């Protein structure tokens, strides 16, 4: 199989909008191994995955953005800030339900990382693909089990894929991971 095709597949698998599905299932069932945990996971998936996907689809459908990957950094600000709004709504739903701290913490980290990423994107194209994996892994390491440190290895093939597809420079890849790890750690601690 051609290397670019493999890189494209990896970029799709590690799409930042898909990662929260696994994150919310793992964390929710860890903190509430019951039907309640399932409901927390479902709420997280709705506000952190599905609603942002619908928003980006609508923006692409009405030509407000050139592609759903938000490849052009100049088009990222409005979608990212709008997505932050969806995350904030999700956070308040969790807060009203008195969700456990880890659920609130991962939701808050999504708010902070995406908000900062939106402003960075006004000036520079940071890799939000890398941020979308590095932050959730950091949350799993500190909120669930340190064994999840092994999941940082996923950043290697993803970084290679983003570089191979010429979506980012090496520095953009490193900074996308680094800022997400740092901000997530600060928020959850």
Regions found by a protein language model. Give the residues of each.
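Transmembrane alpha-helical segments of multi-pass membrane transport proteins and ion-pumping complexes
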Residues: 16-21, 48-57, 87-91, 114-118, ...
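Core segments of transmembrane alpha-helices
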Residues: 19-23, 81-92, 112, 131-134, ...
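Alpha-helical transmembrane segments
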Residues: 36-51, 109
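Short, Lys/Arg-rich, polar N-terminal cytosolic tail immediately upstream
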Residues: 1-8
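Short, hydrophobic transmembrane alpha-helix segments
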Residues: 27-39
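The first (N-terminal) embedded transmembrane alpha-helix
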Residues: 10-30
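Membrane-embedded catalytic cores of phosphoryl/pyrophosphoryl-handling enzymes
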Residues: 100-189
């Amino acid at each position: 199989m051609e290397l670019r095709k493999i890189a494209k597949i990896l970029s799709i698998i590690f799409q930042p909008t898909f990662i929260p599905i696994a994150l919310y299932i793992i964390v929710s069932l860890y903190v509430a191994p019951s039907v309640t945990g399932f409901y927390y996971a479902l709420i997280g998936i709705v506000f952190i995955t599905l609603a942002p996907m619908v928003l980006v689809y609508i923006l692409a459908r009405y030509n407000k953005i050139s592609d759903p990957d938000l490849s052009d950094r100049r088009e990222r600000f409005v979608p990212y800030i709008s997505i932050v709004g969806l995350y904030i709504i999700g956070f308040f739903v969790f807060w009203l339900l008195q969700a456990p701290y880890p659920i609130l913490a991962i939701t808050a980290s999504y708010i902070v990382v995406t908000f900062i990423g939106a402003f960075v994107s006004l000036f520079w194209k940071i890799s939000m693909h890398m941020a979308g994996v590095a932050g959730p892994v950091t949350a799993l390491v500190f909120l669930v089990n340190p064994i999840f440190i092994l999941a940082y290895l996923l950043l290697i093939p993803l970084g290679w894929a983003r570089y191979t597809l010429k979506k980012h420079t090496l520095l953009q890849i490193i900074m996308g991971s680094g800022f997400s790890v740092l901000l997530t750690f600060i928020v959850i601690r």
